[in-house]
Amino acid sequence: MKEKILFEVCCGCTEDAVMAEKGGADRIELNSALFLGGLTPSIGTVEAVKAQISIPVMCMVRPREGGFCYTSYDYETMCRDAVAMIRAGADGIVFGFLCEDGTVDRVRTADFLRVLRAEKADIVTVFHRAIDVVPDVFEALDVLIELGVDRVLTSGQRASAVKGAETIRKMLEYANGRIDILPGAGINDGNVRAFIEETGVKSVHASARSVRYDKSVNGNDEIFFGGLIDGKGVPEDEYKVTDPVRVNAVLTAIGE
């Protein structure tokens, strides 16, 4: 009998969470602004998700895009958000703190863990893909293990987990059960089975999304409500949603 591989789905709203569970996900990571890599979801979203699904909910605490070295104002916001999320029923908190030199901010990470555990002693703690930009990933793991972080989300310091498979395998071996290694970024039904076999991981993280169109902007392609990238804006008449069919396709591929 094959060992169970846990599948965590990255979600950006309440509907995403419901569709993830419908597709068979074991757990979700709840964010907002997935295009920016995932930011803190609203407390209303956390409450709505917890009212709608029964699988564990890991809540992202990331107040802004653009790095992981935060001001004191950012940090106070993160602490308040995390406490509110735990009180709203979050099963885990996802976060990441780096110093200006790119190393794990040991002091702030330790203090944040203290804040979380004061609110709920057994809250699950996850250090996110900030680890993918540290100068020494194994040194970073040592710090996180020492501080008692439960899990780390990583692409193996590459653009996708598939490209970072060798590093992820080495991280898994180095951790040796002292911290969970959760690979994510670019994993789908077409590559997940081979990726698992190559790395030996026991869990995977993916988004499994499809595009949905909103006709309310009337096809006006001159209007952009956000910023521009290379002179172009993100289309305002479309957004991505978790697709239960795609979620199930990943699960089917895992089981092959």
Q: PLM features: residue spans?
A:
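Hydrophobic faces of well-ordered beta-strands that scaffold small-molecule active sites
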Residues: I5-C11, I28-L30, V57-V61, I93-F95, ...
